[in-house]
């Protein structure tokens, strides 16, 4: 069958001219222009628009419009792709085309602005006409802004002028003064309102930047205490802060008073005026004025904090300066009414003759113990001096002793004075230390005419009795031999009023506590100080008092010098000293900071001898060198080994006679012997100059003995080295040794000692100290 016939396309309808809309009624207003129109509509014209061209095919009134064909999806997609491709391609515009587009855009903006202006102008004109019809010519609604600030232009009329009935005259005009004041008030109010708005609501983002404004650094931790200048809201508008007064810090009428230059200028002008007015007495008065100004200026420097204590005069020293001075020299004092230390020999208060001897001997600057102890001893105070070895303690007690004796009558004035014993006694633990003190004391006593005698073991009693036949102001002795002399009636202490105990802790360690108590009990009680506050009064203790028998004497003065403070030493101090002043240099029991301490863990005699030979052969240390051992029989064995290595050596121990001891020390001091092998006998108080090395072949049995062993080097401010051979038998002192090495700034703790089990905690159980030197001090003449 044939298919259905193809449908023919419908004929196109004939378009007719559009029918004009009916005219609006007369009473209706014209509709507003559409918002999207870019230009106002053209004015109406009488002519009709031209009719469109007729189409070819026209349909009748009864025919139907054909239905619109639907759009093809493929066609829409194709058009969309073409539009996207055209938009993606860059389109080149020439300069003329770009200028044309810019001009068209600018013309549209100008036209739009003009249209808005004309529209707003019409409304403003209407509001002005309505204002004239209102009573008093004021309309409250007309002054309220009706649009954003951007729509207001200079063409808009100004707001109505306010009228004040109270200030107007009969003609209805406002007073000129009132208007000016009102304007100023309004300006200030507006400015303050703007500042308040800026403070609480924030400044405008476009105008808040200032190059001079301080910015807070997020990485800077320093707090800023200053306000920014822009944060002062009253600086420009409040008359109180409009002009700030800058403070002046110098000159007349200023914050800090007179400057030195201004004060000097005023004083000189005043002095010149006095000279011009009075030719006769004006010059004298002018000099007095200038002298007063100079004194005032010197007095003003008393409170200056920028000067060091060494640059100030003694009368200008303040409490802060003395505190800094004590910290510089590591001086600590305890006790009531303790005087300040002396800064130099000139401020010591010593007599000029004694000061000349001090400079002649070669004492340049006083040591810390001398700075603190001499002023206290000069006030007749009892004293306990705790200082490290080699700190100058000998001169610290000798110089005040000589001043004390110089005020007493000469001992050879009468025969009975010779028989009553010495004025002062100095106790030392060993013979060598006593003889060393005697040598140092004779440097001062021989020029002053005083007699010094040493009483030590090793010499016959007859020889020492012969030395005492003419009397002596000062006796230097060991405790044991002095007790022998007292018991055999060779010596009495009837007029002894000055007692010095040097190395008191060493005397207790050697078992001399009982002899020391016997000596102190043999002193007369008539010149003993009272145990009251009067013992701290320097004026009362320096005066003579009646001692009975028709004689006047001074109070007894007792001084004790030590490196450590064991319990036995404290017990003696509490019994025989009255309200003592305690001076501590550094810390009690610490080694000298100038000594480098080295510790080596070496077990066995042979290994230690080999290590000692390597040290001596290295050439690192120059003689003299001291080697300490614990057992007397090891001294000779080690000395022989040292001689085989090519070094000269001598020994010093308790089995040696006094002549052998003196000869050994003399050979080391004069440089003829390189190495001194000794026991603890030489560990206390013996001063061998320029010792570069101390070797502890055997570790000391106590940390106190170790402290005094290594104190033989690094004396008088010089540096030295101490090497210690340590073994498992020294477990009792390992903890204390480790603590001492930790405190030393120039020493290092070896890993073997740090990790050793015995060095982790202090031993709690007591151990018996073996005194290998006991046989040397026992028996007749042993002391």
Swiss-Prot record:
Subcellular localization: Cytoplasm; Nucleus
Q: Which GO terms describe its cellular component?
A: cytoplasm; nucleus
> Any idea which UniProt keywords this protein has?
ATP-binding, Cytoplasm, Helicase, Hydrolase, mRNA processing, mRNA splicing, Nucleotide-binding, Nucleus
Q: What is its EC number?
A: 3.6.4.13
Composition skew (Basic and acidic residues), residue ranges: 75-84, 94-114
Q: Which family does it belong to?
A: Belongs to the DEAD box helicase family. DDX23/PRP28 subfamily.
What name does UniProt use for this protein?
Answer: Pre-mRNA-splicing ATP-dependent RNA helicase prp28
Give the organism the record lists: Aspergillus terreus (strain NIH 2624 / FGSC A1156)
| Classification lineage | Eukaryota, Fungi, Dikarya, Ascomycota, Pezizomycotina
């Amino acid at each position: 069958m044939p298919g259905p016939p193809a449908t023919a396309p419908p004929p196109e309808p004939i378009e007719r001219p559009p029918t004009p809309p009916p005219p609006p009624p007369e009473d209706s207003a014209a509709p507003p222009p559409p918002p999207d129109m870019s230009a106002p509509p053209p004015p109406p014209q009488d002519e009709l628009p031209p009719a469109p061209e007729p189409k070819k095919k026209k349909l009748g009134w009864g025919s139907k419009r054909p239905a619109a064909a639907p759009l093809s999806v493929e066609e829409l997609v194709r058009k969309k792709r073409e539009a996207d491709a055209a938009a993606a391609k860059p389109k080149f515009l020439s300069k003329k085309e770009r200028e044309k587009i810019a001009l068209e855009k600018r013309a549209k903006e100008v036209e739009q602005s003009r249209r808005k202006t004309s529209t707003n102008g019409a409304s403003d004109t209407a509001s002005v006409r309505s204002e004239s019809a209102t009573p008093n010519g004021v309309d409250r609604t007309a002054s309220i802004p009706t649009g954003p600030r951007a729509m207001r232009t200079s063409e808009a009329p100004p707001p109505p002028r306010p009228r004040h009935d109270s200030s107007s005259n009969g003609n209805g005009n406002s007073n000129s003064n009132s208007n000016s004041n009102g304007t100023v008030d309004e300006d200030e109010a507006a400015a303050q309102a703007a500042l308040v708005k800026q403070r609480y609501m924030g400044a405008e983002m476009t105008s808040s930047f200032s190059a001079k404004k301080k910015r807070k650094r997020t990485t800077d931790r320093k707090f800023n205490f200053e306000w920014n200048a822009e944060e002062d809201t009253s600086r420009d508008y409040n008359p109180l802060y409009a002009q700030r007064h800058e403070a002046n810090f110098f000159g007349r009428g200023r914050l800090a008073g007179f400057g030195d230059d201004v004060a000097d200028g005023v004083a000189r002008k005043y002095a010149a005026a006095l000279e011009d007015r009075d030719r006769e007495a004006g010059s004298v008065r002018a000099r007095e004025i200038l002298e007063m100004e100079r004194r005032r200026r010197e007095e003003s420097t008393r409170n200056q904090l920028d000067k060091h204590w060494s640059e100030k005069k003694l009368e200008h020293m303040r409490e802060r300066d003395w505190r800094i001075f004590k910290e510089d020299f590591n001086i600590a004092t305890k006790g009531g009414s303790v005087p300040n230390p002396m800064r130099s020999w000139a401020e010591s208060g010593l007599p000029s003759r004694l000061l000349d001897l001090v400079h002649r001997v070669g004492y340049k600057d006083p040591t810390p113990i001398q700075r603190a102890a001499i002023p206290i001893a000069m006030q007749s105070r009892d004293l306990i001096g705790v200082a490290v070895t080699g700190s100058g303690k000998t001169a610290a007690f000798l110089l005040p002793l000589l001043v004390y004796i110089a005020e007493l009558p000469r001992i050879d004035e009468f025969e009975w004075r010779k028989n009553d014993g010495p004025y002062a006694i100095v106790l030392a633990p060993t013979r060598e230390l006593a003889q060393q003190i005697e040598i140092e004391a004779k440097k001062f006593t021989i020029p002053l005419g005083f007699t010094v005698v040493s009483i030590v073991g090793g010499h016959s009693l007859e020889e020492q009795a012969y030395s005492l036949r003419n009397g002596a102001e000062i006796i230097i002795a060991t405790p044991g031999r002095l007790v022998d002399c007292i018991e055999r009636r060779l010596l009495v202490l009837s007029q002894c009023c000055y007692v010095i105990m040097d190395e008191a802790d060493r005397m207790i360690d050697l078992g001399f506590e009982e002899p020391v108590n016997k000596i102190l009990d043999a002193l007369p009680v008539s010149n003993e100080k009272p145990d009251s506050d009067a013992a701290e009064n320097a004026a009362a203790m320096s005066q003579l008092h009646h001692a009975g028998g028709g004689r006047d004497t001074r109070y007894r003065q007792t001084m004790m010098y030590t490196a450590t403070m064991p319990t036995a030493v404290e017990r003696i101090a509490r019994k025989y000293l009255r309200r003592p002043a305690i001076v501590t240099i550094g810390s009690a029991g610490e080694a000298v900071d100038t000594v480098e301490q080295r510790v080596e863990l070496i077990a066995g005699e042979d290994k230690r001898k080999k290590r000692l030979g390597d040290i001596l052969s290295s050439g690192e240390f120059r003689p003299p060198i001291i080697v300490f051992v614990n057992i007397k029989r090891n001294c000779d064995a080690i000395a022989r080994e040292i001689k085989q290595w090519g070094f000269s050596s001598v020994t010093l121990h308790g089995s040696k006679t006094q002549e052998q001891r003196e000869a050994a020390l003399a050979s080391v001091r004069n440089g003829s012997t390189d190495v001194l092998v000794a026991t603890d006998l030489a560990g206390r108080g013996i001063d061998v100059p320029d010792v570069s090395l101390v070797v502890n072949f055997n570790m000391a049995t106590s940390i106190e003995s170790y402290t005094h062993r290594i104190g033989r080097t690094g004396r008088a401010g010089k540096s030295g080295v101490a090497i210690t051979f340590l073994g498992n038998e020294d477990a009792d002192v390992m903890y204390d040794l480790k603590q001492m090495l930790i405190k030393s700034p120039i020493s290092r703790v070896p890993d073997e000692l740090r990790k050793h089990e015995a060095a982790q905690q202090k031993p709690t159980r007591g151990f018996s100290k073996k005194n290998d030197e006991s046989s040397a001090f026992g028996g007749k003449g042993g002391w």
